[in-house]
UniProtKB/Swiss-Prot annotation:
Cofactor: Zn(2+)
Species in which this protein is naturally found: Rickettsia canadensis (strain McKiel)
Protein name: Cysteine--tRNA ligase
Primary gene name: cysS
Protein family (similarity comment): Belongs to the class-I aminoacyl-tRNA synthetase family.
Family matches, as Pfam families: tRNA-synt_1e (PF01406)
Assembly, per entry: Monomer.
């Protein structure tokens, strides 16, 4: 039976049955980071959401049939400003931040995309598309800039579902006397005096660099062609970025529909407020790594809410994710797991229904509970195997219980204290034994006395 996968399409504002143009060549493009500063947890939500989508597509169509492109924006005004502030070269900054991004992705258990193109390596294609737009009267040259003529684009407001005036309310628009219309956006901008040569390129319109929107149109065209299946990104990109992508790509290639399914994830806040450096609540993945918050805890937190809903980062949410994973890992302690290749149907159906991760997590939790309430060894193994299979599918429970409960602790030091306590008990020195137990408890190390000795775990 054909697997049916439904996704909410921002373009049509309906949940649709996903039908790729070619089941042997499923194409997905996702907007990646602008590498000017360390990735924040908002970037991580995007990574986790589309990593899960990638896993689902692979499950349905096979790993060789799915092409996942996630770009790196390494040419941008923010990069220039940041490099000047740090006294760094452009390349030093972008290389360092890109490396940090990759470290973060590995920490969160995200699969590598099929291709991760850099904007600076595709300037020629951007120029090619801009020339097509000029030739078709959808773009014009003014004062060494090249602008896209928004009013020339059919159905410009289709993705945002708002009229033109509403779309630009509250949006910063670059004012220029050389523009034909205030809403027109830049495709190519000239180099500024004394600006870094690393951020500017030769073009038919002089030395300069591309606008942000043309970068994604060029890279998606290079690797996926005029038409592809899925385009992903945050809801904040619907306008202007994705709206402008659609306009310029469809105008450059008139027979193109560009992306068929537009999949957007919701906003991420911190303690109920928008994340910003001015509010002092700007949290990077590196901040969480330095606090020794497990990548699996962060990933479960990111997937705990439906991807289209807002998600709030707070200490309780992280603590809840940690407790949930502790519960799951505790369920498989001392169980000889049976490897199963079949994913339980109820779990898979939850993900096939617009990636309903809250329901998927509930189902995993039910399997964990089933382990503890099982009355037979066979039933216990069944629940434990389904637990680990489902959790693995969404990128969780990739450690043994021992690794999980003892991560980030000095095992030699703890074993010495456990042996010292054991000796104290033999000497009937109950006061010292209790002191050692309490000392370890303060370090979140829990002792369990068994007939054959004492075992410990991180609480």
């Amino acid at each position: 039976m054909q697997i049916q996968f439904h996704l909410y399409n921002t373009l049509t504002r309906t949940k649709e049955l996903f039908r790729p143009q070619d089941q042997a060549n499923v194409k997905m493009y996702v907007c990646g980071p602008t590498v000017y500063d360390n990735p924040h947890i908002g970037n991580s939500r995007s990574a986790a959401v589309y990593d899960l989508l990638y896993r689902i597509l692979i499950k349905i169509f096979g790993s060789t049939a799915v092409k996942y492109i996630r770009n790196i924006t390494d040419v941008d005004d923010k990069i220039i400003d940041r490099a000047e502030l740090l006294g760094s070269t452009i390349n030093e900054l972008t290389d360092k931040v890109t490396q940090e991004f990759h470290i973060n992705m590995e920490y969160l258990g995200c699969k590598l995309p099929s291709i991760e193109p850099k904007a600076t390596e595709h300037i020629d294609i951007m120029i090619e598309i801009i020339e097509r737009l000029i030739a078709k009267k959808h773009a014009y040259i003014a004062d060494k800039h090249v602008y896209f003529n928004v009013l020339s684009a059919p159905n410009y407001t289709e993705l945002s579902n708002r009229n033109l005036e509403e779309m630009f309310e509250g949006v910063r628009v670059e004012n220029s006397k050389t523009k034909k219309h205030p809403q027109d956006f830049v495709l190519w901008k000239p180099a500024k005096p004394n600006e870094s040569a690393n951020m500017n390129f030769d073009s038919p319109w002089g030395l300069g660099r591309p606008g942000w929107h043309i970068e994604c149109s060029a890279m998606s065209y290079k690797y996926l062609g005029e038409n592809f299946d899925i385009h992903g990104g945050g809801a904040d990109l619907i306008f202007p970025h994705h709206t402008n992508e659609i306009a310029q790509s469809r105008c450059a290639f008139p027979s193109s529909t560009y992306a068929k399914y537009w999949v957007h994830h919701g906003f991420l806040t911190v303690n109920g407020e928008k994340m910003s450096k001015s509010l002092g609540n700007f949290i990077t993945v590196r901040d969480l790594m330095d606090k020794e918050i497990s990548g699996e805890v962060i990933r479960l937190f990111l997937l705990s809410s439906h991807y289209r809903r807002p998600l709030d980062y707070n200490d309780k949410a992280i603590e809840d994710a940690k407790k949930t994973l502790d519960y799951w890992y505790r369920a498989i302690v001392n169980i000889n797991l049976q490897k199963i290749d079949i994913i339980p149907n109820d779990f898979m159906q939850s993900l096939l229904d617009d990636m309903n991760t809250p329901l998927a997590v509930k189902i995993i939790n039910d399997y964990a509970r089933g382990v503890f309430t099982s009355t037979t060894e066979e039933e216990k193994k069944f629940n434990a195997s389904n637990l680990i299979t489902c959790a693995n599918f969404i990128g969780l429970m990739n450690k043994t219980p021992h690794e999980w409960f003892n991560s980030g602790v000095n095992e030699l030091y703890i074993n010495e204290l456990v042996n010292k306590r054991l000796e104290a008990k033999k000497q009937k020195n109950w006061l010292l034994a209790d002191q050692i137990r309490n000392q370890l408890l303060e370090q979140q190390i829990v002792l369990e006395d068994k007939p054959d000795g004492t075992i410990w775990r991180k609480g």
